[in-house]
Amino acid sequence: MADSAVPYSLGPSARASSTHRVATGTKQTSALKRRDASKRQAELEAALQRKVESERRAVRLVEQLLEENITEEFLKECGMFITPAHYSDVVDERAIIKLCGYPLCQKKLGVIPKQKYRISTKTNKVYDITERKSFCSNFCYKASKFFEAQIPKTPVWVREEERPPEFQLLKKGQSGCSGEVVQFFRDAVTAADVDAYGAFDAQCEPASSSTWSERASDERASDEEGPGFVSSLLPGNRPKAVGTKPQPHRQSSTVKKKAAQKMTSKHGEQTVSEVTEQLSNCRLDSQEKVATCKLPAKKENTQISSPGPLCDRLNTSTVSENKHSVSQVTLVGISKKSAEHFRSKFAKSNPGSGSASGLVQVRPEVAKANLLRVLKDTLTEWKTDETLKFLYGQDHGSVCLQPSAASGPDEELDEDDISCQAQNTLDETLPFRGSDTAIKPLPSYESLKKETEMLNLRVREFYRGRCVLNEDSTKSQDSKENELQRDPSFPLIDSSSQNQIRRRIVLEKLSKVLPGLLGPLQITMGDIYTELKNLVQTFRLSNRNIIHKPVEWTLIAVVLLSLLTPILGIQKHSPKNVVFTQFIATLLTELHLKCEDLENLAMIFRTSC
């Protein structure tokens, strides 16, 4: 009992001591926490201070790099305390103040181009010169990019524990680049891609017949909807084949039809070399099909079998394909629409290729007849009485020939021509030519007499001041006035201004061809311009007879010059005229014309209108 009563009596003191120990431990723990928190805060403030100081130091270095006379050692030291973004700011700021973007260069920037791209004819590449504009030369641009690539990308405030990198600078004399190369397409298909594609197909399961039939139908549909023009061989600028998922739809149609069927039948028995050999054979066979394919025509079916540019191109492409790798070229199919278009182009390019060239070429006789007919019609429309008065004076009727009434010396008139001529002469004598005026019946004599008396009476009353108009007549006059007010007429076209424009056009065209004709005559354009202008002012010009080809204008100038020769005072048998005659004869020979043709054109101005 005594033993058990001792702890019971010590209970309050023990509880007090334990409470004191707990309170003491809590105070110590809180003190440690406050100490750790203050320590962490101090460390955080120190880290933040280092970060701010590092950023300030980087900004100061950026400002110092904007100055001139920067040494290599200083630039290398700055590379440890800046980032690529800071260096880009240095380049931009130096470009703004018209300094070269490379800190070691002290040159000024000249005229900065405004374009974004530059095409190099030496390398056949397109360069993006957006960043290149900030440098004075290609070397400075390359040296700057070389130094920028060595700058660490880590934050500047964590580099104290890192090992400083060893910066290297480009030496002078090393070539630079014009900018970043613009990639318009991916790399071409290589032999490794073809081998990988063949090995993967050899491991794949054989495709079903329905799949190949669907692909064949798709290829036929694509052939029918082919492009407008065809090139037999194109450089193989296609994407590289992926090793896991090749895309057979992007390959050539011949590879789908022949090589794929053979590879699926043999599975994995074929090697890579055999697959490559089969691909080359398929391409050669498809070339023969393109060379001997039948081209559709509307009237008759023809086949290109004669030697021409197409056959030569296919032969050369076949030889080059045997020499080079198979994967460097890609075959393009030919469609029906493209074949027809190519056949027309082939016919135009080969003048002696049968009946197709006969449709394109025009015989010299036909061209000569058309030329003379156009010139004759034009000069006939131009000729007026004023033209004859200017050339031959007021009494041109005695000098000029009368136009023949008969249509031809050996032509006989039939009954229809005689009746037509009689009808024409009758129409000229009568005051009216048609039967439209005789549709209404003629008024009687009594009605005409009464109408005449009424008119005389109204005239007498008008002079006496007693004339009173009827309501119907006044209404009709008012309605006519209203109609005139409602429907204003447009101003007439100034025909004289139109003629002035046409005369100016004719004089400009003649002024372009006359200097070459006036050389043998040893006269200038100013000597004949006044007479030529006066002659053109007498022409009857329209919007159709002033449009001619250069050859036609040359012949027109020759005709007009022959008409103005007497007015200019050039004698017929003078040495100048003899040289001019020889020159004109040479010109007519080149145009497949004769002197008689030129005389016939000049005879138009020697006949009366």
From Swiss-Prot:
Region described as Disordered: 1-37, 208-272
Keywords (A to Z) from UniProt: Acetylation, Coiled coil, Cytoplasm, Hydrolase, Metal-binding, Nucleus, Phosphoprotein, Protein phosphatase, Transcription, Transcription regulation, Zinc, Zinc-finger
N-acetylalanine PTM sites in chain numbering: 2
Biased composition (Polar residues): 15-31
InterPro entries: Rtr1/RPAP2, Rtr1/RPAP2_dom, Rtr1/RPAP2_sf
Enzyme Commission numbers on file: 3.1.3.16
Enzyme class: hydrolase
UniProt subcellular location: Cytoplasm; Nucleus
GO CC entries: cytoplasm; nucleus; transcription preinitiation complex
Catalysis performed (reactions): O-phospho-L-seryl-[protein] + H2O = L-seryl-[protein] + phosphate; O-phospho-L-threonyl-[protein] + H2O = L-threonyl-[protein] + phosphate
Residue stretches in coiled coil: 33-69
Binding site for Zn(2+): 100, 105, 136, 140
Gene Ontology MF terms in the entry: protein serine/threonine phosphatase activity; RNA polymerase core enzyme binding; RNA polymerase II CTD heptapeptide repeat phosphatase activity; zinc ion binding
A Pfam family this chain is assigned to: RPAP2_Rtr1
Zinc finger (RTR1-type): 77-160
Any single GO BP term: snRNA transcription
Primary location recorded for the protein, binned into one broad class: cytoplasm
Sites of Phosphoserine modification: 9, 222, 476
Assembly mode: Associates with the RNA polymerase II complex. Interacts with transcribing RNA polymerase II phosphorylated on 'Ser-7' on CTD.
Family affiliation: Belongs to the RPAP2 family.
Functional description taken from the UniProt entry: Protein phosphatase that displays CTD phosphatase activity and regulates transcription of snRNA genes. Recognizes and binds phosphorylated 'Ser-7' of the C-terminal heptapeptide repeat domain (CTD) of the largest RNA polymerase II subunit POLR2A, and mediates dephosphorylation of 'Ser-5' of the CTD, thereby promoting transcription of snRNA genes. Downstream of EIF2AK3/PERK, dephosphorylates ERN1, a sensor for the endoplasmic reticulum unfolded protein response (UPR), to abort failed ER-stress adaptation and trigger apoptosis.
PANTHER family given in the database record: RNA POLYMERASE II SUBUNIT B1 CTD PHOSPHATASE RPAP2-RELATED
Name of the protein described by the UniProt record: RNA polymerase II subunit B1 CTD phosphatase Rpap2
Natural source organism: Rattus norvegicus
Gene symbol of the encoding locus: Rpap2
